[in-house]
From Swiss-Prot:
Signal peptide bounds: 1-24
Chief location of this protein within or outside the cell: virion
Cellular component terms (Gene Ontology): host cell Golgi apparatus; host cell membrane; membrane; viral envelope; virion membrane
Function: Envelope glycoprotein necessary for proper maturation of gM and modulation of its membrane fusion activity. Also plays a critical role in virion morphogenesis.
Subunit structure: Interacts (via N-terminus) with gM (via N-terminus). The gM-gN heterodimer forms the gCII complex.
Protein name, entry field: Envelope glycoprotein N
Residues in compartment: Intravirion: 82-98
Recorded name of the encoding gene: gN
Keyword flag Ligase: no
Post-translational modification (record): O-glycosylated.
Species name: Suid herpesvirus 1 (SuHV-1)
Amino acid sequence: MVSSAGLSLTLVAALCALVAPALSSIVSTEGPLPLLREESRINFWNAACAARGVPVDQPTAAAVTFYICLLAVLVVALGYATRTCTRMLHASPAGRRV
C-alpha cells in the first residue's frame, strides 16, 4: 500500500510539473502584451487627457465622497470606542465610588 506521504509528494510533484510551464509563460516577456505595456508606460502622460475630460488638477467627486465617508466612519468608530471604554470603566470595581 502506498503511504500518504509518498502520495502527497507525488501529487505535489505532478502539480508543480503542470503549473511551472504556465507560470513561465506568464512571466516571460515575449509576445505583444509586454510591448503594449511598455508603450502605455511611455505614453502615460499625454496632453490629450485634458481633452478627454480627465481632471488632473482637481479631485473627482468620487474621491471627495470617499474621503467624506471615510471621515464619517472614523468619527463613528471613535465614538463607539469612547463609549465602550466609558462603559468598561463604569462597570469595573475600580471605576465605582464607594
